Amino acid sequence: MRKLIAAGLVVVTVALTLVFAQSRALGQAAKSADPIFGRWMMDQTRSVNNRGGDHATFPTQHVRILAPDGDGVRNTLFNSPAAPPQYSYSARFDGKDHPDSRFPGRDQTLAHWHLAPDVIVRQQKTDGKTSEWVIYTVSSDGKVFTSISWAPSNPELQDVQVFTRAN
């Protein structure tokens, strides 16, 4: 079963890469009314940190704020509600590689697509090769935000972060 899931994720990764490569302009402008924007509080009981393969829970309640910023998004992450931001960066929804300001001096880039009012996709590249995919989605009622991320080298090791709207 794990092999099927891993194979499926590889197929999805390849398909997403092809779609994005063929349609760099694909996407939508950021609109403040889009349901994906807001302040989101992690539901630790429904979130799984599996990058190490151990299906661990997150030790603290993360807070993520997604806000429209020009023709893109400002993405801010706090490791707990009382902590200072772990990171905060702005990104354009143009599907192009831009330097990753979270790690100055590294050969790391981020590309973002706003595929629908409730979907954002992020591709991270390190040394020119895709090192992470992230898909952000919001439920149809706008109350639940989910972040699913994985590294192409181990697609079966996914982080699933589930958040509820805080504002």
Positions of PLM-derived features:
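Bacterial N-terminal signal peptides
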Residues: L9-V19
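Positively charged n-region of N-terminal signal peptides that target proteins for export
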Residues: M1-L4
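Hydrophobic small-molecule pocket/channel-lining residues, especially in calycin-type beta-barrels
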Residues: L26-N167
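Cleavable N-terminal signal peptides
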Residues: V19, R24-A25
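Generic secretory/membrane-interface signal
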Residues: A6-V11, Q28
